[in-house]
Regions:
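GST superfamily/GST-like fold recognition
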Residues: 149-174, 183
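GST-like domain detector, emphasizing the conserved glutathione-binding G-site
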Residues: 1-134, 140, 146
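Acidic/histidine-enriched, glycine/proline-rich intrinsically disordered or flexible terminal extensions
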Residues: 204-215
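Short, conserved loop/turn and helix-capping segments at secondary-structure boundaries
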Residues: 40, 52, 178-185
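Surface-exposed helix-capping loop/turn segments at secondary-structure junctions
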Residues: 141-152, 196-200
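Catalytic cores of nucleotide-enabled group-transfer and carboxylate-activating enzymes in metabolic
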Residues: 35, 43, 138-144, 162-169, ...
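Acidic, serine/threonine/proline-rich low-complexity intrinsically disordered regions
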Residues: 123-124, 173-179
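C-terminal end-helix/capping segment
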Residues: 180-197
Length: 215
């Protein structure tokens, strides 16, 4: 008797886009195989399916290839979402936050985290402060009202935004902790300590495929 093939996720542990995809698949209760790539030696099979060469890439059992993290999240919750994670993320406020996260905030985050790539090490504070203004301050204001972006319980937007806030906070942890953004800091701490995050961040053997059971 042959086992039913599972979706195959090409991933990279620390990539925030891959992180959001892994968490969505886990929340949706979807078992999947994960292949943690080696950045300097990307799998030929992945490049044949997705020549852009970035992760995440999800290959479905029928051969369909999803190359964008938000498409993977949407697909996962369209399979199983009794708690309404995806539906509750469709509010105007959440859509606006997500657009800023993946647009203006990510632009500034890259320049803050990797100033040497942009020949602007001396002016690192400028993109840092712009990132706070673009996303973190509005995010804190929204979290003050409910605690999660889905209201009293989280939604897809929480999982989509969290990995990028985590990345920002890790650049200068002491400075981030000093910001007057208590709701955001509590929200981030909660997700960092969440069993979902622990499962999604399990260290996998590089270049090998490991099965994630339905969570």
């Amino acid at each position: 008797m042959t086992s039913t093939p599972l979706p195959l996720l090409y991933s990279y542990r620390r990539c925030p886009y891959a992180m959001r995809a892994r968490m969505a698949l886990l929340v949706a209760g979807i078992a999947f195989d994960a292949h943690d790539i080696v950045l300097r030696d990307k799998p030929a099979a992945m490049l044949a399916l997705s020549p852009k060469g970035t992760v995440p890439v999800l290959v479905l059992p029928d051969g369909t290839v999803l190359e964008q993290s938000l498409d993977i999240m949407q697909w996962a919750w369209h399979q199983h979402d009794p708690a309404g994670w995806w539906a509750r993320a469709q509010s105007a406020d959440n859509q606006a936050l997500l657009a800023v996260c993946d647009g203006a905030f990510k632009h500034q985050l890259d320049r803050y985290k990797y100033p040497e790539r942009f020949d602007d090490v001396e002016h690192r504070a400028q993109p840092r402060d712009a990132a706070v203004e673009a996303l973190l301050a509005p995010l804190d204001a929204q979290l003050q009202r409910h605690g999660q972006l889905g209201g009293e319980t989280p939604c897809a937007t929480d999982l989509a935004v969290f990995p990028f806030v985590r990345q920002f906070a890790a650049v200068e942890p002491g400075w981030f902790a000093s910001l007057p953004l208590p709701a955001l800091q509590a929200w981030l701490a909660g997700w960092l300590a969440h069993p979902l995050f622990e499962t999604a961040m399990a260290k996998l053997p590089s270049g090998q495929t490991v099965r994630f059971a339905a969570w």
